[in-house]
Regions:
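Low-complexity, acidic Ser/Thr/Pro-rich "mucin-like" tracts of secreted and single-pass surface proteins
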Residues: 1-201
Length: 201
């Protein structure tokens, strides 16, 4: 079918030799019009990884999935963190399931009006996940959370030019926005996820 990947194995056999099986990956269609770079957030119902029973794109607060209820469902309006210095849910960061390797990636914080107020990371050459380690609690998002977590964590502050220091943001609605591009292509994909600063709940 046009616009889809084809995966399988090519098997070479002979009368007086070992059988050799090789993995084959092909794509038929327009490469740049194919699937997204970043998997859709888990709560949208459109996540590719979720259909395979794996966790995927979301927001973490500290060491837990933010906004997740007892049934394991993520409720977007409940995604929040509390940067109050108690070492519990003090930071928020995006968890990303990559469907394809990215040429560039930028992670930003937006205010309630969807205006960028801080850039957490801007980097290049982000590889697609090549394997899933079910023994690792980080699962499919190991690549980003392990190697880049320190860069994409948001502690609830923004830079204040007048004082030259980072200052705490007010409670309320914010967003984590991730923009990625493909190698050799000018188009980009942006995934934006809500996150609240809540110091009173």
């Amino acid at each position: 079918e046009y616009g889809h990947f084809v995966e399988g194995f090519a098997t070479l056999t002979g009368d007086d030799c070992e059988t050799l099986s090789l993995p084959v990956l092909g794509f038929y269609g327009d490469w740049f019009a194919a699937e997204n770079i970043i998997d859709a957030p888990m709560y949208t119902g459109e996540s590719v990884y979720m259909t395979q029973g794996m966790l995927s794109t979301s927001v973490a607060a500290g060491d837990i999935f933010a906004g997740m209820n007892e049934a394991g469902e993520t409720i977007p309006e409940y995604i929040s963190f509390s940067p109050n210095g108690d070492l519990e849910m003090d930071t928020a960061f995006p968890i990303l399931g990559l469907l394809r390797s990215a040429e560039t990636m930028t992670v930003e914080v937006l205010n309630g009006n969807m205006v960028p107020i801080r850039t957490l990371m801007s980097t290049t050459q982000i590889p697609k996940l090549l394997a899933v380690d079910y023994a690792d609690q980080n699962g499919i998002y190991t690549i980003l959370t392990d190697s880049m977590q320190n860069y994409i964590e948001w502690d609830g502050t923004v830079y204040d030019q007048s004082s030259g220091k980072y200052v705490a943001c007010d409670e309320g609605q914010y967003y984590l926005s991730v923009t990625a591009t493909l190698p050799g292509f000018d188009g980009e994909q942006t995934v934006t996820m809500p996150v609240k600063i809540d110091l009173t709940a």
